[in-house]
Amino acid sequence: MASREMLIIISVLATTLIGLTVATDHTIGGPSGWTVGASLRTWAAGQTFAVGDNLVFSYPAAFHDVVEVTKPEFDSCQAVKPLITFANGNSLVPLTTPGKRYFICGMPGHCSQGMKLEVNVVPTATVAPTAPLPNTVPSLNAPSPSSVLPIQPLLPLNPVPVLSPSSSTPLPSSSLPLIPPLSPALSPATAAGTSLPLFPGSPGSSSSTTSTKTVGTFPSSTTGTTADLAGADSPPADSSSAAKTLVLGFGFMVAMMLHLF
């Protein structure tokens, strides 16, 4: 793409420069000028005269002039019917058409001494027209199809539910239920001669035997004797203390089960 754009720019510049080419001024005879004794034929052989150029004749007006004549008058050095005559000492002749043109000096004897010039004017060099570029040249700023990404539609975002303090559900507490405090007042019988039953999982349940409350002494079946119960004389246990103990044990059992599960 960059090379094609560069070629286009170069072609346009070349065409413009050719169109703006300045016409060449040919000073007749070179440094010697338009005078007797100058080798005008040799000088003209090394020049190229094209349409648009100019012929410049420099000479002393008191001694020379410039006369344009036809081919027969040029050959005979006789300006019978001159086409145009210049006598100002610095004559400028534009070359507007291709073909041959003939010039001599009209002073007597000067043409025969070599003051004659034949000029062959060639057409201006033409440049072949640049082939038109196809209309399919992409723009430099146009993005390529592969670089255009499809636009994905935005998905609606689900609103995040906001829980109000009134609708919040309390989380289950992992803490163990509080164990009711032990009753500070136990009956004398419980404090002195009774032991509380131990439940599974308690610190004291590691022993293989289960402690039981000693209520009294039963008569031995082997002796067959009848004896009074050992605790007959002891005062009866307080019913409220026993109820508290039962509730305490049941609560402890429930606490241990909740802890295990």
Curated annotation (Swiss-Prot):
- Would you tell me the Gene Ontology cellular component terms? plasma membrane; side of membrane
**Membrane topology designation:** Lipid-anchor; GPI-anchor
Gene3D superfamilies in UniProt? Cupredoxins - blue copper proteins
Q: Where is this region: Disordered?
A: 194-239
Q: Describe PTMs of this protein.
A: Glycosylated.
- Molecular function (GO) terms listed? electron transfer activity; metal ion binding
Query: What does UniProt give as the signal peptide span?
Result: 1-23
SUPFAM superfamilies attached to this UniProt entry: Cupredoxins
The record's subcellular locations are: Cell membrane
PROSITE patterns in alphabetical order: COPPER_BLUE (PS00196), PHYTOCYANIN (PS51485)
Instruction: Name the domain of life.
Output: Eukaryota
Q: For the lipid attachment GPI-anchor amidated alanine, which residues are annotated?
A: A237
Q: What is its main location?
A: membrane
Give start and end of each Phytocyanin domain: 24-123
The record's disulfide annotation reads C77-C111
- For this UniProt record, give its keywords in alphabetical order, as a comma-separated list: Cell membrane, Copper, Disulfide bond, Glycoprotein, GPI-anchor, Lipoprotein, Membrane, Metal-binding, Signal
Give the binding site residues for Cu cation.
H64, C105, H110, M115
Q: Which InterPro entries match?
A: BlueCu_1_BS (IPR028871), Cupredoxin (IPR008972), Phytocyanin-like (IPR039391), Phytocyanin_dom (IPR003245)
Q: Which residues form the propeptide?
A: 238-261
Protein name per UniProt: Uclacyanin 1
Q: Tell me which species this is from.
A: Arabidopsis thaliana
By which gene is this protein encoded?
UCC1
